[in-house]
């Protein structure tokens, strides 16, 4: 019963976070096609690592946002095949998958669940804005 409402709320939360990143050359905001409704269980943004000033990295951005008591994570398990469980199995590729590696090294993930308060969401937006301002300084 509540899935449509929750999905709409997650998408609205994701849109607010994405809007903060959209105009910075240091980030890529993936936008799904309008042909379907994104489930938006998490909000992912890619850091354009090569565009960052020398003293900045994805990990520093993550640490700076987290230091403001805002949950910010490295994202998905893009190369799960590197886990020990895949040792000695036919499911590990012979060479690392280039796109999976790049996404794993550049992703930032933010929470967008429908129970986030307006205060929490605004705190997230404010933290991201302050870190982007530091990068641009």
Cite the ranges covered by each PLM segment:
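PLP-dependent aminotransferase class I/II
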Residues: 1-137
């Amino acid at each position: 019963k509540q899935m449509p409402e929750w999905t709409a709320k997650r998408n609205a939360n994701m849109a607010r976070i994405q809007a903060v990143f959209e105009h910075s050359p240091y980030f890529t905001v993936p936008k799904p096609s309008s042909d379907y409704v994104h489930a938006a269980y998490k909000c992912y943004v890619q850091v354009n690592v090569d565009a960052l000033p020398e003293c900045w990295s994805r990990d520093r951005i993550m640490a700076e946002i987290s230091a403001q008591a805002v949950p910010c994570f490295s994202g998905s398990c893009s190369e799960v095949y590197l886990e020990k469980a895949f040792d000695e199995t036919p499911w590990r590729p012979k060479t690392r998958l280039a796109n999976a590696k790049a996404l794993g090294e550049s992703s930032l993930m933010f929470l967008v669940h429908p129970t986030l308060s307006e205060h929490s969401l605004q705190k997230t937006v404010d933290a991201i804005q302050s870190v982007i301002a530091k990068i641009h300084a």
